[in-house]
């Protein structure tokens, strides 16, 4: 059975099938922007209340659970080893796990399981911080394997590699933006999802210095009119690339106006309709109109905001743009003008690394202590609930079939009752 979900995106409308909307196939969900179209989601829970099941985890991670149908996929660090786990989403039981790589290391909030898997509903692909990239079918059979560091040189990020692949049509788009611990150039590549073959690889040159070339972001997909572009942030700039060739189509500088040598970027670019939102290390967050070519630093700039996030990726529905900083200070901006509608407003004082999710007219914002603040979306600041799992949490929430999936250091939680 199929039903249509109509999303207003500027003046365009897209019909989205239930299959897509009810799954969480990539890090930022079915629409690649932290939004779910689902309704009647849980607002209240605790470690004991409104929990359908929980599965013991061996370690913390920044990777988000990836969900398709009856399967949940997890990038998991277990001591020195990294595995892909496949979990039964109904029972919360481990179905299989496959070895990805040895050589796991921990660096502050980072370990080598930080990249989230991606799936098209038939196969699943997962990257590790050690550079191993593998594809599997849903039974756990390995399709292919790549060692990106062996092929193209050691990663040179100060805190280790953490970018998730972007899956679009027949390919994975993988970025390696680094410079703190290497003189090798940064690059972006397109990999055939069926064979693992590199279809193209392009250098991404910038003038960033010391740690500023390092980027822990994930590529974003920009679609407007008949145009499709891959958006990359890092190295003091944001760029748009032709997915067919990798050619750089446009570039906006200005993400590091003071040429700070420690301006690595963690929060990923956000795309909604024909606008690209590019966070940096707090300021400035830039909003850019799509369609420009060449140097669009000034020509495409719609607005700039001086209180952006460091780690959490923002979320927008095209009308309101929500920012959460690392201390739990929130802003709601007009997505078109950048004007503050509300904020600064502080939610629970803590450190925030998880990215907010927008669904069911609510914002879900989780801090590192495992407390999720649920807020009413829209032009008025209103806290609906605070829900504490009391455990170290870096992962962002995932939503599927009326349930919320939260991954902490100790457990994977399935929250609420399933709605089909």
Show where each model-derived region lies:
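Noncatalytic, solvent-exposed loop/strand surfaces
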Residues: 20-420
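Bacterial N-terminal signal peptides
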Residues: 6-16
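Positively charged n-region of N-terminal signal peptides that target proteins for export
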Residues: 1-4
